[in-house]
Amino acid sequence: MTNLSDQTQQIVPFIRSLLMPTTGPASIPDDTLEKHTLRSETSTYNLTVGDTGSGLIVFFPGFPGSIVGAHYTLQGNGNYKFDQMLLTAQNLPASYNYCRLVSRSLTVRSSTLPGGVYALNGTINAVTFQGSLSELTDVSYNGLMSATANINDKIGNVLVGEGVTVLSLPTSYDLGYVRLGDPIPAIGLDPKMVATCDSSDRPRVYTITAADDYQFSSQYQPGGVTITLFSANIDAITSLSVGGELVFRTSVHGLVLGATIYLIGFDGTTVITRAVAANNGLTTGTDNLMPFNLVIPTNEITQPITSIKLEIVTSKSGGQAGDQMSWSARGSLAVTIHGGNYPGALRPVTLVAYERVATGSVVTVAGVSNFELIPNPELAKNLVTEYGRFDPGAMNYTKLILSERDRLGIKTVWPTREYTDFREYFMEVADLNSPLKIAGAFGFKDIIRAIRRIAVPVVSTLFPPAAPLAHAIGEGVDYLLGDEAQAASGTARAASGKARAASGRIRQLTLAADKGYEVVANLFQVPQNPVVDGILASPGVLRGAHNLDCVLREGATLFPVVITTVEDAMTPKALNSKMFAVIEGVREDLQPPSQRGSFIRTLSGHRVYGYAPDGVLPLETGRDYTVVPIDDVWDDSIMLSKDPIPPIVGNSGNLAIAYMDVFRPKVPIHVAMTGALNACGEIEKVSFRSTKLATAHRLGLRLAGPGAFDVNTGPNWATFIKRFPHNPRDWDRLPYLNLPYLPPNAGRQYHLAMAASEFKETPELESAVRAMEAAANVDPLFQSALSVFMWLEENGIVTDMANFALSDPNAHRMRNFLANAPQAGSKSQRAKYGTAGYGVEARGPTPEEAQREKDTRISKKMETMGIYFATPEWVALNGHRGPSPGQVKYWQNKREIPDPNEDYLDYVHAEKSRLASEEQILRAATSIYGAPGQAEPPQAFIDEVAKVYEINHGRGPNQEQMKDLLLTAMEMKHRNPRRALPKPKPKPNAPTQRPPGRLGRWIRTVSDEDLE
């Protein structure tokens, strides 16, 4: 949608940059077409906390320039004192003439402690005020929260260690470029002369009626009598000018006036002083004119200006004590703030106040500002600029999303941890083809679907060549989500009359419920077609419904990759894993934009696209290859992924590339391969096998390579890869439940693999992991230390324990706690927990809890069968029983939830019984019990299959019955007397330790001995 020449584009870069500025700048897709360059500018400040431990940071989140904000510290007298301005790292006016702000985010938090302080304390309040800074009436720590009633624009009592993030959201669109106040060529007699070109469009003008026949009267005093003629609130952080005039009349001879204008900052101090008149003598009986014509350049405004004041000093030539002085005045002034009314320049403002932070601590402000910039003539000689791309669909989509930001949970101020967690949701919003899985969890899915339906057709309206793409996307939405999307947009939900069940796309929807797939329920059908009651659709499949080239029928080999994403200096790393496919040729059109243009050369000089250009791949290949991320694999097709995956590093994909180069399969090989090859062609072990194992098993694939469950690797890769079969996965097989090739104890191993946390593999990190493993094997104390670390990470208290260690450097408190802690098996422990052991209550569930668990189990079982009305509450009302056949038939025919305890016998029809032949039963039993060529199944198993056919009136087993038969077959195989006896396992010398629920990121989750 955002690139009319590239129909594979899914991301709207502008809204992605708005919601996640750390992803970089993007051109604003409006109709302001000027050649520009994109630039991302950082801002980093370490602010020292004052004596009171409190302070205030004022941000101008929408200001189109280098100014970011200002910092104030709270003094002992209750007033704020200006500390410093916050700017971007580069002074933009020095190199650029014009600017447009694209996006901006700033993070405020503290992670340092001054000397003598052992705990990080203090809290933060933050609020976004839709007015200007001078309009705030209460800037105290608690008073800030009353500045707005919008809950999405304020947060309170956030720990200073967690921090807050300020997100700039636009208040207007289709804006022009702003002149930055850049210096212009000029020559003057004064070497300090400076000439700049400031922004003159959209000025903010304050008109002040200074006096309307104001009467002044006083007695003479030495030095004159000073009065404040007026004081008014204004807002300025850029250049300003003051114009106007005052007219004075007097009847006293020898009066002398002086006038001074003061520009006052937010903290009440005078920033700029200008003498307008000095020793002006007044003539009696006439109008005495005092003109005002001031220009204040930007470089003299060193802090935000919030008010202006005019003082008049009255004196008398040759005056004596007691002489009368009087005059009257009238007139007006106009204060013009250049560019002050540009949206975002002076309003809104975001205020972040911190309190009770240790004196001397450092509060860090870090963030990024993204701009569209037009360089000055000198820089333009060496900097390439280009036009922005006009995309009405992307612009309309962005406007519609942000117009509903309150309903969609898009805030301007966030706790930093919450903002980091929301990044995946923001990526869903920016991706037009995303299935909105996270948005559905928050209840935002219908809103975004309706917005997509409105925004996407704009492309086909304005650009006819893009109509097929918009039509295909719209049809995909109507096909899978039409009823719910229409309901969200105001259209009544009703049967659409489309025979959706007859479509071949239903075949792409798997019943893999354990992957947490979302439910696309109640797809209405016409009477002559089968009814599809709630298909469980995977995110990849939903993405495929909108994407035109998501399914690729081509030979490929697969390998898993462990990757990390690094956001910025203030954001931690986040782990992710992905399956990749190796396909032949240069196919960058199938890659996501984040991977295109990156490749690595092999030893033979060929290229492998999708790898980071880091050295040479230690392989000799006969052709070029491309690696692409995938979401799923079915039979002879792979489903491509358009997730923003970075280029690959490391050597764990060498085995898959080598297999592809030698055998050149015509269909995807349904085995995930992992393994690095050395110069001798031998397979070397790779790290992070547990995470790769989880990635493979999410797709129902085996993991082949060093350390896999069931593949014995030889020393030479050519011998190893010949063992790979072509074993397509059945359509109705669950991804990783009861897989026949898993050993009986694989469930625990897989659980550990799923819970593991790893990092991107690099040679340095692999060496460090091996060194830690070797040290743990020879040093029991080090092994115990690693166990403690794993326990801390498993329970999420690593940071808490680190802070506790700072407050207890000699471990006195910890020793006392451990000495007094109840031991396992002690009297107090048995009295509290029974005999179940330390920390586990020895009691069963109450009858009510057991009944609720039973209702939940029945409901989940019904859900796997497509019966979604049987919620736990409905099952409880139905006498804690599942739905009867009559209730199910009533729901299928009427589309209404049946009443509990009503059998609906009128809807039950007796089924015709038909008998299955012995040959049919034997063939089915042989197919289920083992592969062709093996011994025939025992008679007991044939009898079990015959019972199933009898129960089903001559039909074959359903999913649940097939699962039970597979389990029965596995049990009978283990009891087969002809089966070789397993080798006896040696008894351990030491008692086995309780395995942790989740291992640490530095320890391999599955050892080689466990995998044999």
UniProtKB/Swiss-Prot annotation:
Active site: which residues? S652 (nucleophile), K692
Residue segments, region Disordered: 970-1012
Q: What is its EC number?
A: 3.4.21.-
Site (Cleavage) location in chain: A441, F442, A487, A488, A494, A495, A501, A502, A512, A513, A755, A756
Which residues participate in a divalent metal cation binding? Answer: D30
Q: Which Pfam families match?
A: Birna_VP2, Birna_VP3, Birna_VP4
Q: Does the keyword Metal-binding apply?
A: yes
Q: Which PROSITE patterns match?
A: BIRNAVIRUS_VP4_PRO (PS51548)
Provide the Gene Ontology terms for cellular component.
host cell cytoplasm; T=13 icosahedral viral capsid
- Gene3D superfamilies registered for this protein in UniProt: 2.60.120.20, 6.10.250.1030, Birnavirus VP3 protein, domain 2, Capsid protein VP3, domain 1, icosahedral virus
Q: Please name the GO terms of the biological process aspect recorded for this protein, alphabetically.
A: proteolysis
Modified how? Specific enzymatic cleavages yield mature proteins. The capsid assembly seems to be regulated by polyprotein processing. The protease VP4 cleaves itself off the polyprotein, thus releasing pre-VP2 and VP3 within the infected cell. During capsid assembly, the C-terminus of pre-VP2 is further processed by VP4, giving rise to VP2, the external capsid protein and three small peptides that all stay closely associated with the capsid.
* Record-level Gene Ontology MF annotations: metal ion binding; serine-type peptidase activity; structural molecule activity
Query: Where are the compositionally biased (Basic residues) regions?
Result: 975-986
Query: Any idea where the Peptidase S50 domain is?
Result: 513-755
Could you list this entry's UniProt keywords, alphabetically sorted.
Answer: Capsid protein, Host cytoplasm, Hydrolase, Metal-binding, Protease, Serine protease, T=13 icosahedral capsid protein, Virion
Question: Where in this protein does the record put region Interaction with VP1 protein?
Answer: 1003-1012
Q: What task does this protein carry out?
A: Capsid protein VP2 self assembles to form an icosahedral capsid with a T=13 symmetry, about 70 nm in diameter, and consisting of 260 VP2 trimers. The capsid encapsulates the genomic dsRNA. VP2 is also involved in attachment and entry into the host cell by interacting with host ITGA4/ITGB1.
Protein known as: Structural polyprotein
Species, as recorded: Avian infectious bursal disease virus (strain Chicken/Cuba/Soroa/1998) (IBDV)
